[in-house]
Swiss-Prot record:
Keywords: Oxidoreductase, Thiamine pyrophosphate. It comes from Pseudomonas putida (Arthrobacter siderocapsulatus). The branched-chain alpha-keto dehydrogenase complex catalyzes the overall conversion of alpha-keto acids to acyl-CoA and CO(2). It contains multiple copies of three enzymatic components: branched-chain alpha-keto acid decarboxylase (E1), lipoamide acyltransferase (E2) and lipoamide dehydrogenase (E3). CDD domains: TPP_PYR_E1-PDHc-beta_like. This is 2-oxoisovalerate dehydrogenase subunit beta.
């Protein structure tokens, strides 16, 4: 299959384009996703190509957007819905938890909610406290939801196509800092302009990436780093700069979790560091630490370390002090190696 060099934005648009063409039941909607093409231009050109009945705008009502999507899914459509920022999902919480996640269970399988809820998440664009949150832990503990976060254009397209085809409701979190290329997380360097970021080769047509399989992005033997989204690149840079032979695992799917890959890696290395951008207390990293303790306790050579955002709102002026950069991750890698 031919490939094209794409950003994550372009890869996501390509995924929706492929599925709109393949399946007449697929519809795309949300705030400003029609003619405007979305606040990040992920849906640019799709309404022109497929018409206003397939790609259309929604009122500024997250609860109404999700509730409508649940109804569409119950009656045969496959909605791909955008919440403009993950920070805005809170008004839709009841629809997500009580309706979207539980429809199949509550109807004894008579109805399903095969919808994909796309949400840009995380910091790195100076969005401040209301445009920078990483709320993944709130979704992973809701029974009935799948939660996905890609870290690169190839995975973004393949995971989004797989999500649209899935009969389960999927929370699809998109790290904004990666929209136009990878980022190494150094807050003590000028932020690389998006136009200069390297892109990735992405197949032009249809393909999928499994919704429940992690990827080892950097093989290693000394310590296992469990991470996802933007911090995948931070962990890779930290491993190189610290000189620690770290194995970096990109979870890709936060739930269901690829526990087999995690356990196999930690049993091999005997050490584990968990890295994510969200706040520390009750963050998804706490669940990862618990699972590693349960399944790998007798193989551990050192206590598990966590490197996360701080337990504060996301500060605009101090964004890079909040963000877990390579220096903090590198210090954790060295710490577990000293035990």
């Amino acid at each position: 299959m031919a490939t094209t060099t794409m950003t994550m934005i372009q890869a996501l648009r390509s995924a929706m384009d492929v599925m709109l063409e393949r399946d007449d039941n697929v519809v795309v909607y949300g705030q400003d996703v029609g003619y405007f093409g979305g606040v990040f231009r992920c849906t640019e050109g799709l309404q022109t190509k497929y018409g206003k009945s397939r790609v259309f705008d929604a009122p500024i009502s997250e609860s109404g957007i999700v509730g409508t999507a649940v109804g569409m899914g119950a009656y045969g459509l496959r909605p791909v819905v955008e919440i403009q920022f993950a920070d805005y999902f809170y008004p839709a919480s009841d629809q997500i938890v009580s309706e979207m996640a539980r429809l199949r269970y509550r109807s004894a399988g008579e109805f399903i909610a095969p919808l994909t809820l796309r949400m840009p998440c995380g910091g790195g664009i100076y969005g401040g406290q209301t445009h920078s949150q990483s709320p993944e832990a709130m979704f992973t503990q809701v029974c009935g939801l799948r939660t996905v976060m890609p870290s690169n254009p190839y995975d973004a397209k393949g995971l989004l196509i797989a999500s649209i085809e899935c009969d389960d409701p999927v929370i699809f979190l998109e790290p904004k800092r990666l929209y136009n290329g990878p980022f190494d997380g150094h807050h003590d360097r000028p932020v690389t302009p998006w136009s200069k970021h390297p892109h990735s080769a992405v197949p032009d047509g249809y393909y999928t990436v499994p919704l429940d399989k992690a990827a080892i992005t950097r093989p290693g033997n000394d310590v296992s780093v469990l991470t996802y989204g933007t911090t995948v690149y931070v962990a890779q840079v930290a491993a190189e700069e610290s000189g620690v032979d770290a194995e970096v695992i990109d979870l890709r799917s936060l739930w269901p979790l690829d526990l087999d890959t995690i356990v196999e890696s930690v049993k091999k290395t005997g050490r584990c560091v968990v890295v994510h951008e969200a706040t520390r207390t009750c963050g998804f990293g706490a669940e990862l630490v618990s699972l590693v303790q349960e399944h790998c306790f007798h193989h551990l050579e050192a206590p598990i370390e966590r490197v996360t955002g701080w337990d504060t709102p996301y500060p605009h002026a101090q964004e890079w002090a909040y963000f877990p950069g390579p220096s903090r991750v590198g210090a954790a890698l060295k710490k577990v190696m000293e035990v």
